[in-house]
């Protein structure tokens, strides 16, 4: 599927008027569109090559935001209530709709969203081959080393993680291994109807929708993985789960926000992972001059 085709697939979830606005974009712009933003009271905008621009139509109505959710849920909000509580919906093709509105709270937790005020349709695109520049450096002797992918937000950590999972699972440039993925927010595999919407390989098992630490332990106990993967280490329990898994002989593959090894050592959350030698390789992603650059470093 081409980038423009992915755009056309994604916008089918929009109400009719907004869908027509989106499809008025030229094919070249469709291929470069990353997101469509719908804000009540303002015209819909498109994020194209990093720049947000209005599409020129009338302001988005609150009813259109409700229609968006009705279409995305196939007229069954109850079936997707757990996703809505987390602020997003995953639709066929791996595309994602982020939602904002008034939170309905119960016992200190978000139970639902009402009076929707904005939505963000993020267009999913598979980037097969993204891991090619780093694969040799991460697979000494043909087998994946414990690897941490590190970069500031928005530089492609998840894209690189997904393609590494796919390559390892398929035995592309390395030994084929069983991979288990804890995909808390569904951003890596984008499961829909029990199937990954984005390619993560034939030997990959996925659990999504639960906290990362719990997902890691579930996979470790139940699926016998050779590689355990997770996107975005963000909490102490994630660190504890990865440290425990490292002691079980499974290879680890993870991402984190940061700028380099010294940055991680200064932060209490990540310091134990480096001091205890949980990871053997570090991949840094930078974008000087607008082009991504990957650097592989040995950590031990």
Give a label for each model feature:
Residues 223-282, 287:
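Conserved P-loop NTPase nucleotide-binding/switch module
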